[in-house]
């Protein structure tokens, strides 16, 4: 397994590219990406991880901010290039960007797996989108990881 964190460049690979889409809200969301990376360490894949070590929470979230624009564009490119997208909706967060990303990619035909535990504030919306587009939805991160290994 190879992990590529934002904003490092990436290209197509022989092994599947897996994008980790999900709650990142600092101070609220668990670092679920670390758990996925550790669990997939022995798999033949490249993980595209938007959680960056040098994240600046004070950066203005405006298109005119080059730092912010770089992050958003990296994520959009990674979502488009990914063979598999893993979504995780942490019940302690709102995750509006993750909801948007699911909406953008639900119909693409990409292999998508969603983990939306009980307690997520818009779980019903996520359930309906997954049912409509034939996307597998699970309740725990462990189930998400297990199903991801099967897809790889």
Residue ranges and their predicted role:
Residues 1-152:
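Conserved catalytic or regulatory cores that recognize and/or transform ribose-phosphate-containing ligands
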């Amino acid at each position: 397994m190879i992990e590529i964190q934002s904003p490092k460049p990436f290209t197509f690979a022989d092994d599947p590219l897996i994008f980790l889409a999900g709650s990142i809200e600092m101070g609220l969301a668990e670092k679920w990406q670390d758990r996925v990376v550790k669990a997939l360490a022995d798999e033949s894949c490249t993980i595209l991880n938007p959680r960056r070590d040098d994240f600046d929470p004070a950066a203005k979230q405006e298109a005119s901010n080059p730092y912010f624009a770089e992050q958003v564009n990296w994520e959009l490119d990674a979502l488009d290039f990914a063979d598999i997208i893993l979504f995780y909706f942490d019940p302690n967060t709102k995750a509006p960007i993750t909801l948007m990303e699911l909406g953008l990619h639900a119909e693409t035909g990409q292999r998508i797996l969603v983990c939306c535990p009980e307690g997520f504030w818009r779980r019903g919306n996520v359930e309906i989108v997954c049912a409509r587009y034939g996307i597998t939805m699970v309740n725990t991160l462990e189930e998400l990881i297990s199903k991801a290994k099967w897809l790889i």
